Amino acid sequence: MSLANIIDHTALKPHTQKADILKLIEEAKTYKFASVCVNPTWVELAAKELKGTGVDVCTVIGFPLGANTTETKAFETKDAISKGATEVDMVINIAALKDKEDDVVEADIRGVVEAVAGKALVKVIIETCLLTDEEKERACRLAVSAGADFVKTSTGFSTGGATKEDIALMRKTVGPDIGVKASGGVRTKEDVDTMVEAGASRIGASAGVSIVKGENASGGDNY
């Protein structure tokens, strides 16, 4: 498997425009990234442009705060899938996790898993920078119990991104059969290698092209 095949080529900034998305899509076709990860408003366009290419369409749910109701997250998910999404990255209810309301957290994740109805992968963003190690472990266990396919470190919109320590902890917690996605601040091939060595099976990055070319990405995009 090539380096590009594990990267979700990502554009999630609120001011991302149509031309930016079309450029992202063309780059994904050229380099054969695993997916493009875009906000829900761009899913239909991405699905149309990527049909038959083998590149998946990933979108975000309850993003970036995770503070939507479960019903809202489920609606977002169904809507995204109806428009062509094949992967969804949802944000957990972080406050409920911190309040030790594990049943609420698990039900929230399960609401998205059930909305997917087997038509898309579900990745669960736990926002590691806001959690203790115990909370990270608990979040991962709840995601697995709810039927998620992946756990993911970060939105890229909070106080920090992926670290090798968090990836190792998440991999140890979920075991070998669940995906672990590193996102937030992964900007070079060296960053990717570090995350993969720690246990990541997918990378979320806006610097995908620079990464596969072995170049240093310019700018300070947290994703």
UniProtKB/Swiss-Prot annotation:
Lyase listed as a keyword: yes
Positions annotated as active site in the UniProt record: D89 (proton donor/acceptor), K152 (schiff-base intermediate with acetaldehyde), K181 (proton donor/acceptor)
Pathway: Carbohydrate degradation; 2-deoxy-D-ribose 1-phosphate degradation; D-glyceraldehyde 3-phosphate and acetaldehyde from 2-deoxy-alpha-D-ribose 1-phosphate: step 2/2
EC number: 4.1.2.4
Domain of life: Bacteria
Subcellular location field: Cytoplasm
GO MF annotation list: deoxyribose-phosphate aldolase activity
Catalysed conversion reaction: 2-deoxy-D-ribose 5-phosphate = D-glyceraldehyde 3-phosphate + acetaldehyde
Induction comment from the UniProt entry of this chain: Induced by deoxyadenosine and thymidine. Repressed by DeoR and glucose.
Keywords from the named record: Cytoplasm, Lyase, Schiff base
Cleavable signal peptide: none
Cellular component terms (Gene Ontology): cytoplasm
BP-aspect Gene Ontology terms: 2-deoxyribose 1-phosphate catabolic process; carbohydrate catabolic process; deoxyribonucleotide catabolic process
Main location: cytoplasm
Keyword hit for Cytoplasm: yes
Top EC class of this enzyme: lyase
Name of a matching Pfam family: DeoC
NCBIfam families in alphabetical order: deoC
Family named by the database record: Belongs to the DeoC/FbaB aldolase family. DeoC type 1 subfamily.
Functional description taken from the UniProt entry: Catalyzes a reversible aldol reaction between acetaldehyde and D-glyceraldehyde 3-phosphate to generate 2-deoxy-D-ribose 5-phosphate.
Name listed for the protein in its UniProt record: Deoxyribose-phosphate aldolase
Organism of derivation: Bacillus subtilis (strain 168)
